[in-house]
Amino acid sequence: MKVAEGISRDGGVLALGGMPLDRVLAALRRREPAASACWVYDLDQVEARATRFKAAFAPLGVHAGYALKANALPSILRRVRAAGLAAEAGSLGELIAARREGFAAGERILNGNGRTPEEAEFAAREGVHSVNADHIDELDLLQHHAARAGTSVRVALRVNPGIDTHGHAYVATGHDAAKFGVAPAEALEAWSARARWPSLRLDGVHLHVGSQILDPGPLEAAADTARELAEESARRGAPLGLVNLGGGFGVDYSGAGPEFPLEAHAARLARKLAALRVAWVMEPGRWLVAPAGVLLAEVLWVKRRGGTSDAGSRRFVVLAAGMNDLLRPALYGARHRIVPVRARAGKEEPATVVGPVCESADVFEREALLPPLERGDLVAVLDAGAYGAVMSSNYNGRGRLAEVVVDGGRLSRARAGEDAATLGARDVDEALEG
């Protein structure tokens, strides 16, 4: 029985990529005896989704750069690269990770709104496909390092188009109050004055209006803005050769709503943009990897507490994973489906599913309908392949979890979990003056 994409229930046991999830934790415990939770990813699904994305936008010849911030696990980067995608990095660390996993200079896109000298130097010295510059002054920094390295760096100016995606405020990036990008008029002036930066190939525009977008309307509005800017810049004698439409493609975390209409959206863009002769770039992240991962966690405790009103008692299910592992519910109010690995017989009833962190925000779901659960049972938090492990922390003195991959029926530990006893390894007592 299929539960979600890549998720099935075989013989009563939940499986990811055909791998029974109870087997995953049992295998991990041979390496990490105390493990009670871990991340699990289906690499075949990652590659299949990357291939599907590339095929959908093939009519435009889109150069797709996978957004490392979604999940930068080396095993995942290798599969994305195998599918023919490039890498989009938002920091020096992500640039280095992309280089380490074999992404060539022309396959690395540098993003971010707080450009550092180290990032600019890397782009000039090591080479990138392009840099998305967030403001005009950044061009001076990029020019300095490109001139010193004796190279030319291609640059796209990020434009804030004033488009509201009507999603969570923390993932809306294209409205007027967002911190990203320059006004369209500023970009037009900079493109016309590109001779000021002779070591830069300043012929691109970058628009990224938000994340977790299920209605393609805002993305198509951004594409219209990009086309209008390219046409106006050409009229001013400064034609553009690169249009980067960013990412933002959402996934249906509820399992009840519509999926992002990827192929239909791609077809509409191809029809409306085909006449614009430029190089196209997109930066998918979440859409590629979120459905391919789960957070697997043991049930530590189940408790019932009597109510103080007519509402009666409340059932709390305490997991071995917490908000330090999967921050999205606490940070964004995000809701993930939570499914028992082995469903016990009995009526489904509401439960508040929480973690062990000493915070009232450490709640995965307040009204999850779940069958009876007991201590030691396993549950899977679905669609956890993006913005999960990459955002985890050691808050509350908790070690980060191991990351396990399923690859064609083979199970591997791709990243070791942290032992709480070794979390002080970075602590020092070193005088910095005197």
Which residues fall in each region the model found?
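Structural preference for beta-strand elements that scaffold enzyme active sites
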Residues: 61-65, 84-86, 105-109, 130, ...
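Short, glycine- and charge-enriched coil/turn segments that flank and shape catalytic ligand pockets
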Residues: 59-60, 147-151, 236-237, 256-259, ...
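Active-site beta-loop-alpha junctions enriched in small/polar residues
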Residues: 67-73, 90-93, 113-115, 134-136, ...
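Electropositive phosphate-/nucleotide-binding environments in soluble metabolic enzymes
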Residues: 18, 40-47, 51, 70, ...
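A charged N-terminal "starter" segment
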Residues: 1-153, 197, 201, 235, ...
